[in-house]
């Protein structure tokens, strides 16, 4: 797989989730407009005016952050290898995937955000790989919902980032092919069969690997093994 394929997948994936991002922006924009209208009509009180202004400022800052992070992730770039915080990347991905999670009635369980999970690689590419896995797990629970659990465990110089869903698992006949470029069991045009292959390509480029297995209680566990910092 070449870099061009990764960037094409990046544009396709973020084009797909732009509705969810716009939904997040709309939520904060409603706060801005609502409090702006309230300030126009309400009577006295410097305190109330200040409270309204603070709400507007907070919502505006959140909108700016969403747009900044989205632009940062979608922009093509040459990968770099540098230390970064996994928790920071994950918090940004939550915003991007929240709409899909809500629509699928999926609850996302995250590791302790205060845990010092630091790794070395390209943060944007790592985020792309993880986002592909998160959305894949969300789709595995389509129609019934469930819990998507993200974990992080340090072992022998590598972080094992796990994503466990509560779907039906992967058929043994399909399991050997899930990381093949273009392989998909879905018919929708938005599913190109490139999510897991791109994730594998990115993680391999970091000096790690990715694997998948069915869980005894049902569902699938995907593990991204990446170098710790």
Task: List each language-model region with its residue ranges.
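Acidic ATP/Mg2+-coordinating residue in the GHKL
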Residues: 165
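Short conserved segment of the HATPase_c
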Residues: 170-182
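Conserved DHp (HisKA) dimerization/phosphotransfer helix of two-component histidine kinases, i.e.
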Residues: 50-100
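Short beta-strand/loop element within the Bergerat-fold HATPase_c
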Residues: 147-157
